C-alpha cells in the first residue's frame, strides 16, 4: 500500500533526531506566516505523530512545503530533499539561501557541541545516486584514519607567542576525533621537525587501512612558507618550512598508502604582514578584544586545502578564543558534515567570512587551494 502524506511526514521527522525535532518545533512556533501555530499548542504535543497531525490539520495541502522550509531552516537539507522526492513534490522552489552565520559569539559553545551524525538512510541515498562519483569510505570497524595536528604556540622570540591557539588545538582535535580520526599531535616544531613529522606521518602503516587523511598546521607564516619555532626575522630567518613540502611528502610517490584517497590540508597562518591589532566589537565598545595575526602558506591528485586567508593578507586570532578560521571551520563541520561533501563544507566556510559582522572592520577571506579531488568526499560522521 502506498504511503500517505502523513506517513512520509512522520518518516522525515523521525529521522532528524531529538535535538533537531526540538529545533523544528521551535521554528514552527516562531513562524510568522499565516496560518500560525501557537507555542502553547506545540508544547502539548507528545510525539511526532501529534506533530504530524498538527501540521496536516493546520496547513492541509501545504503541510509538506511548510515542513520542508523548516527542515531547511534547521539545516536538515538531506531529509527535506528526500521528503520532497518521496511525496512527488520535487518541483517545490527552494527558498533564498540564508545569510551566512557569523562565528559563535561564545566560542566555548564549540566545546559543548558534537558533530551531527549522518543517517544510514542518507548515506545509502548518496551511494545509490552518486556512488561512482564519490570516494570509497571504509567500514568504521576496520578502518584506521589518521590526522596530523601541528600547532606552533611558543617561539624563541617571545613576542611571536601565538596566544589563544591552544583553544584552536583543543577544538580541532575534538572535531577530528568526532570524525573518527586518530590524532597525532606534534606541538612547537622547527621547520626541519615539521618536515620530519610530515614525512613520518606519510609512512604510517595505518594509512593502508584508511580511506583518507587530514593534516592541520597552525603557526606564523609567509606567503609560501610556515615558520618554525626558532624563526627570527633577523637572527634566524631560515627556519621556515615550504608549504609545497606538505604535498611532496604526501604525494602518490612518497605516500603510496594514501594513493587515490582524499588528503585534506588545513593551514592556519598569515600570507603577509606581521603586526598585531586591536578590534572592538560593536556590541561591546567598552571591552576591546585583542586580535593578533598569523602569517601563512601552499601543491597533486586527491588533495584539497583550505587556507585561513588569501595571498598577501592577514589571518586574525583572538588571544583567548583562538583564530576565526578554526572557530568557523569547526562550527561548519559540526553542523553540516553529516550531509555535505568536503568542497561544499569549504564553500560554507567561505560564505561565513563574507558576513559583514564576522570580525568587525577587519577583512579576511579563507582560501580553497590546490583542489585536485576528482570525486566527492563525504565524511559520513558516525558511520
Swiss-Prot record:
This is Caspase a. It is found in: Inflammasome; Cytoplasm. SUPFAM superfamilies: Caspase-like, DEATH domain. The keyword Protease applies. One of its GO terms (cellular component) is cytosol. Induction: Up-regulated in response to pentachlorophenol (PCP), a toxic pollutant. Up-regulated in response to bacterial infection with E.tarda. It comes from Danio rerio. Its EC number is 3.4.22.36. The gene is caspa. Residues 8-81 form the Pyrin domain. The two subunits are derived from the precursor sequence by an autocatalytic mechanism. One of its GO terms (molecular function) is Pyrin domain binding. It holds the Pfam family PYRIN. PROSITE patterns: CASPASE_CYS, CASPASE_HIS, CASPASE_P10, CASPASE_P20, DAPIN. Residues 1-142, 275-296 form a propeptide. Keywords: Cytoplasm, Hydrolase, Inflammasome, Protease, Thiol protease, Zymogen.
